C-alpha cells in the first residue's frame, strides 16, 4: 500500500513527472506507462484499498490523458527527440504504451482509438523484411545493420510483435520468430549486461534493455500455442537463473541501485504465465444509418415541399 500511495502522489507530479517534453531526452513517459500498467493490474486483481479506489481511477484517467498529450506528431512515443523538428517514434517505448492502453480500454476507460492506430502504424512501419524492428521508426533510411540487425533488435522484437498481434497486425509466425530471435541472439545481450557505456558497436545494445527484453519475451510467449509455451518458458527461466546475482537479485547496470529495476522486471517475467495479456484491440465500428426506402424519401420530400409553399390569406 505504501508503494501505491507513492504512485498516487508522484506519478504525474509536475514538474518532474508532468505533461510535456523537456530538451532532447525526457524519460517521464516510461514512468507514466509503467504506473498506468501497475494501477490497471491492481484493479484487475481487486487489490486497490477501498479508500483509494476513487484516487486510483482518477490517476488512471490522468495518466491516459498525459500519454495522449505527449504523443509525437505522427504517432507513438519517444524519450529522445530532436529540437529541430519532427521526431520518429521509438517502437520499444511505443509498444508498452500501446499494451497499457489496450488494458485500460479493456477495463472500460475511454481511449482515443486514433492514438492507438497511429502508434501501431509506427511500430509496423519500423518492422524490416528480416523481422527485425528499427530502433526508431524511419523505414526510408533502413539499413538492416547495427541497431537494425537481428542481434541489435532482438530485445525489442517480441514486444513489438506482441502489440501488433493484439492490434490485429501480426501473425503467429512473426511472434514465434521474435521469440526465437531473442534466444538465438541472447549472447549479444549478455555481452552488454552490466557493462559501461550505452550503445556500443557492433550492434549498439545498451545494457538497460537486458531485463526489459526478458520481460516482454515472457509476455510474447503467452501468444504461442500451448505445446510450445512450456519449452520457451523453461529456456527463459534457465537464462534468468544464469544471470542471477549472488545476493538473489538481478541487475543489468553497473549501479547497485538499478538492481531494484532489474529484479522487478525479472519477477514480472516469471509471473507472466499467471498475468493475462490485454484484450485484443478492436476499433469500434461506427455504423452509418441505412438509407430509407424510396417511398419514404419521396414522402419526406413532398411534406417538406408542402411546408415551404406560401400560405394564401
Model segments located where?
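An alpha-helical repeat/solenoid feature that recognizes helix-turn-helix modules
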Residues: 1, 12-117, 125-235, 249-283, ...
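Active-site neighborhood of glycoside hydrolase catalytic domains
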Residues: 122
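TPR/TPR-like (Sel1-like) alpha-helical repeat modules
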Residues: 240-241
